[in-house]
């Protein structure tokens, strides 16, 4: 009986082994930023990984002017890490004239853009972290020059 228990314990441990991690080096994300500045690209996905049936991803964003409209991601929560630059970031409020857009190629899923109405403004600077829950309107209303930031996106598994 003891050998059978040991075998079952071993099989159980093997089935629950952790999934291999996704690694992004400093050199990797700095190379992405350098290329996107040269190519004038705003949102550049770096890597994505399946997690619990959903998707976790990292993207580099580089903006030279504030956004013309605000954005809501229906299912994706984003966490921003400001790397360089300063500006004013607005969260909350609501969208006027909202239009659906599919941002799946950026790992941001079904989203809506529209005119920002209300919300809370905050000054952001290098080192700041902002968590934007799914369904929250957000945008940069002003920039003091170019701004670069990493975005961590998580889209949970969708119920079928």
Which residue ranges define each predicted feature?
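Conserved metal-binding segment of the jelly-roll/cupin
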Residues: 123-143
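Acidic, glycine-rich flexible loop segments
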Residues: 109-130
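Short, conserved beta-strand element in jelly-roll/cupin
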Residues: 74-89, 93, 102-114
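Bacterial N-terminal signal peptides
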Residues: 1-12
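A short, N-terminal "cap"/entry segment at the start of jelly-roll beta-barrel domains
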Residues: 11-75, 159-160
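A short hydrophobic beta-strand segment most commonly corresponding to one strand
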Residues: 145-160
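A mature extracytoplasmic/lumenal domain signature
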Residues: 62, 76, 83-86, 91-95, ...
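His/acidic/aromatic-lined binding-pocket segments of jelly-roll/cupin-type domains
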Residues: 71, 78-81, 122, 129-130
């Amino acid at each position: 009986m003891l050998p059978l228990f040991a075998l079952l314990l071993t099989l159980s441990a093997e089935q629950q082994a952790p999934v291999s991690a996704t690694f992004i080096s400093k050199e990797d994300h700095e190379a992405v930023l350098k290329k996107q500045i040269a190519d004038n690209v705003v949102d550049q996905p770096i890597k994505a990984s399946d997690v619990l049936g959903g998707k976790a991803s990292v993207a580099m964003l580089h903006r030279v002017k504030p956004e013309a409209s605000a954005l809501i991601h229906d299912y994706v929560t984003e966490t921003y890490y400001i790397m360089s630059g300063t500006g004013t970031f607005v969260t909350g409020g609501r969208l006027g004239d909202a239009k659906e857009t599919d941002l799946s190629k950026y790992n941001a899923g079904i989203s809506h853009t529209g005119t920002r109405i209300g919300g809370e403004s905050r000054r952001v600077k290098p080192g700041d972290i902002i968590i934007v829950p799914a369904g929250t309107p957000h945008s940069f209303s002003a920039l003091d020059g170019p701004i670069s930031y990493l975005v961590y996106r998580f889209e949970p598994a969708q119920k079928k």
